[in-house]
Amino acid sequence: MTYQENYQKWVDFTGLPDYLRQDLENMDEKTKEDAFYTNLEFGTAGMRGLIGAGTNRINIYVVRQATEGLARLIESKGGNEKERGVAIAYDSRHFSPEFAFESAAVLAKHGIKSYVFESLRPTPELSFAVRHLNCFAGIMITASHNPAPFNGYKVYGEDGGQMPPHDADALTTYIRAIENPFAVEVADVEAKKASGLIEVIGEAVDVEYLKEVKDVNINPTLIEEFGKDMKIVYTPLHGTGEMLARRALAQAGFDSVQVVEAQATADPDFSTVKSPNPENQAAFALAEELGRQVGADVLVATDPDADRVGVEVLQKDGSYLNLSGNQIGAIMAKYILEAHKSAGTLPENAALCKSIVSTDLVTKIAESYGATMFNVLTGFKFIAEKIQEFEEKHNHTYMMGFEESFGYLIKPFVRDKDAIQAVLVVAELAAYYRSRGLTLADGIEEIYKEYGYYAEKTISVTLSGVDGAEQIKAIMAKFRNNAPKEWNTTAITVVEDFKAQTATAADGTVTTLTTPPSDVLKYTLADGSWIAVRPSGTEPKIKFYIAVVGESNEDSQAKIANIEAEINAFVK
């Protein structure tokens, strides 16, 4: 069906709400094509898109269609899955509560139990709720750190991790089989609340989550001595982190936490920031201002659904250093392993997990403590799968998992990135370095001196719409078929094609990769540096990752600059 035919189907539907009809009427031809040329697809983390009318937008009909697919998947299982039900949470975005209760209404029409949070909650708490309530699945309405015009829909499996590939593929099949999203039936929400089929949850689950999060901090004595007076500035960037982060920090003994109050209110427009993304230093503007006023040692920011955390640390000159996701991962891993080693609690079979595009510095740190590093595809569900595997086989003890995109998980009572846990570890880290008369910035430098000057850079290029999708395909094809034989005058030693599941050495030897197929290419160089390229699974972007190791910070930065210039020239 052409985009014009899809558009006309929506125009002809008489039950369309006024706000969506107005959206249709205001579309120019280019917008119309982008909104209707395809269906919003599930990526590494469910589906995410612009809010509005269209098959390639997120709206009540696309949400109903996705949930109808989930309901059919649940019914196909044939056991007690309907009774176990689905936990549903949502963030602070436009239409998030509506999408959550639309999902519950579709499930209820099928006689499927749902537990819906009474108000906004973090993604990690949804993951926890699935496990705590023994649900079959979970739905999180969020677009994570995307700008305000976006929303999204993530599906979780019974282990609390994002739905694994097998079930996700089955779910996609069920969703695609639904030809008319306008025909999806919904139950009356208030009636089903009264009958108990839709159950509203809240504080009781918060309390259980906060009980579990107590175990994240390793050294309570250290916190008692150096954490009480340590000044921390926290901002939830208008999102869900405010629901739990402040309480978790107070419970752990961090009494001098200052919150950026202008960003503590839920605001779907994220009015005080250009983008509510803690990866971007611009999101820290108000936190830096407050930090200077109160003399804060560390600034922490969580994204709207509180699964990612950004960190800035005080430097000797009084300015704040913005840490990369890889630097946060490295300093966390070093501290967790060292603290457990000092306490005599480091297991012999200790294991860490990271994505294939995250820094090798953490691998080197892990190995120095006798721990094993497991590399997985991008998407935290693959780390959740590893945790499940460790539990089933009893072969490794999970210590920490992370992705360079500012996602961390310490304790596996949650099976997705958890910024609340990460905030607690960052606060303890700051207390640890303070106890030594140092800052977190000093800690990063110590790691570089011990393990080498690792540096990384991620370049994200946004290519929207039909043309953008074609450009992304063309760039991937060019890298796959005509990539250079060297980068920065350094020979490529291995090319890993995760789509073909092959690793090809310079001498032509080919080995098979054991990870599931994924559209990622990675080039490892003779000096240990690497370049990776992949399309984003959730946004119209292509991402280039550069990772190097050098003799000094200047050496590493020069290598990155050279490789970045070569990538730009190659892509043109």
Task: For each feature predicted by the language model, list its residue ranges.
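Glycine-rich phosphate-binding loop plus the immediately following alpha-helix
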Residues: 156-187, 326-349, 354-365, 419, ...
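Phosphate-binding and adjacent anionic-ligand microenvironments
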Residues: 292, 296-298, 319-321, 339-534, ...
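An N-terminal, well-structured beta->alpha segment
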Residues: 3-103, 193, 198-229, 514
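Gly/Ser/Thr-enriched, mixed-charge loops and adjacent short helices
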Residues: 29-40, 151-285, 289
